[in-house]
Amino acid sequence: MTIKVEDNKIIFSRTIEAPIEKVFDAYTTKALFEKWFHPKDASTKVFRFNAVSGGDAFYAIKTPTMISYTLAEYKTVKRPYLIEYIDSFATPQGAKDTKMPSMKITLSFSEFNTTKTTVTSTSVFPTKEAAQQVINMGVEQGMNQTLDQLDALLK
């Protein structure tokens, strides 16, 4: 996985050994999403999942030391190439946690030789400091482990 920070953006890219349709399905199908969208030694519980333009998702990621809740508001979903959504920390009841920054995430998918797909994620934060706060929370390690889970699921 490659990662770079540009002002208020965090951009990472990773190539997965799977066709584009399978990778896209893993992001947009509840049963698949729950199996991989978490770091090693964690689990995901989806409470609501409608990964379409105008839809949303509410889920929890449980690690051995904590539970974090996320609200995703899907703006654009264009199968199998693009997902744009607003990602917010949430309360256990599914409301946005206004103490933490929301981010706009753009996921783009590109296929190579019908057997490999590169996922590029661009997260845009309200400020450079908000992006740095998320980096300091360990997003790089967490995303790398999460994408390891995706890679293992689709092999």
Model segments located where?
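Hydrophobic pocket/interface hotspot
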Residues: 23-24, 33, 57, 74, ...
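Alpha-helical scaffold segments that form or flank carboxylate-/histidine-based iron centers
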Residues: 15-19, 62, 134-138
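Intrinsic-disorder/low-complexity, polar/charged segments enriched in Ser/Thr/Lys/Arg/Asp/Glu/Gln
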Residues: 7-13, 20, 44, 56, ...
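Beta-strand/loop substructures that line and gate deep hydrophobic ligand-binding cavities in soluble
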Residues: 94-141
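Generic C-terminal helix-cap and adjacent flexible tail
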Residues: 152-155
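Hydrophobic ligand-binding cavity/cleft-lining segments
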Residues: 1-44
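Hydrophobic-ligand binding "helix-grip"
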Residues: 34, 39, 47-50, 58, ...
